[in-house]
């Protein structure tokens, strides 16, 4: 009985995660006892469990930080805001996937199970407080990601993407564990983050070569999840070969979860090596912003262009990680990631809607889409303009606050690179918008001429997600202050 009460006590700290686990069990039960005609229930249960989990998080807001499960899991506002972002991503991605699944005849239950399980892994990673949980949680996320990326088994590109993703993911995980082993040994056998720092102080190993090896290895391992340059090789192939709803899901959730983990790992165990990891991240940010935006200009595939764009975007996010909580770096990073979720998913909503109906992903094949589907074209244009940082859209104010925090922290060169590459990104975003809005008959492609709005009920779900994303992407600057204030409350 005592063990049962202890389980209930610790379980109360992971109540949002328990809701998702219950949703997973319910999905399996319904799928095994009903026929294919009851598929709307599967979407309903998945979306409801995600919304209920978000509600549970909001009710727990501003509670005192707590450590549960013998120090393995930490609950505080900082972790919960990242969990909220992951849940928000998943909630918006499920409506985006309805039409794609119907058109491609993918297995629905397994798809939803993998999405919810990956979400669960990302949430546990946000609250992980020891090395074992920090390793197991992203592996849970990664395994589901591998399965989702190869979900269309008959597609050669999907199989190629999965193979590359799996091999590079396995290699990065082994490098990450290697770094953890150096931390574990140098700290005298500690696995909790704060205890590792205390152990390094006691053993006088915080400036040893072993810590440098650990720092490099962990940076490489986490870099695979964030996909900054030069750890970006898998990103374009996975984006191009994977099903579009899967790409939309992975493009945001993996970065949110990895950012939450990176801030805690770099800020606590490597407290005495701040100059070293700042330098490493500055190099990654510069390479990401330059390579990501320059290579994106040359792409002809919409998904590959967004892949390189995401590499550049993570360079901006890294600026917030480097600044830290001293100059509102974390607050600006959280705010920008919230806007990035809406901007990116809104852009992918267009691809999900256009791709299955036309069978193309080429950027030039979108020419003249405004003449056939004005809502889709205008919504896409707003999201792309926000990604480029055009005022008065949300992306502009998100970047402005992020760069201002970096400037105040003395990262003048890094911010200058960010400003220049943002200007470069505007070029290829405007190029796409020009194609979308063209009305010249000579430029309108056969794919657009034959384009038909879907009569399926699933079209409404895509439009619902897109409306939410467009509204969030076009929030004017007057809403920035309360958003920044909420983000500042999350600092640990």
Swiss-Prot record:
It is an enzyme of class 7 (translocase). It is a multi-pass membrane protein. GO terms for biological process: ATP synthesis coupled electron transport; photosynthesis, light reaction. It comes from the Eukaryota. Its EC number is 7.1.1.-. GO terms for cellular component: chloroplast thylakoid membrane. It holds the Pfam family Proton_antipo_M. Keywords: Chloroplast, Membrane, NAD, NADP, Plastid, Plastoquinone, Quinone, Thylakoid, Translocase, Transmembrane, Transmembrane helix, Transport. Its main location: plastid. InterPro entries: NADH-Q_OxRdtase_suN/2 (IPR010096), ND/Mrp_TM (IPR001750), Ndh2_N (IPR045693). The chain crosses the membrane at residues 6-26, 39-59, 81-101, 106-126, 131-151, 165-185, 209-229, 277-297, 305-325, 329-349, 377-397, 400-420, 466-486. This is NAD(P)H-quinone oxidoreductase subunit 2 A, chloroplastic. It comes from Illicium oligandrum (Star anise).
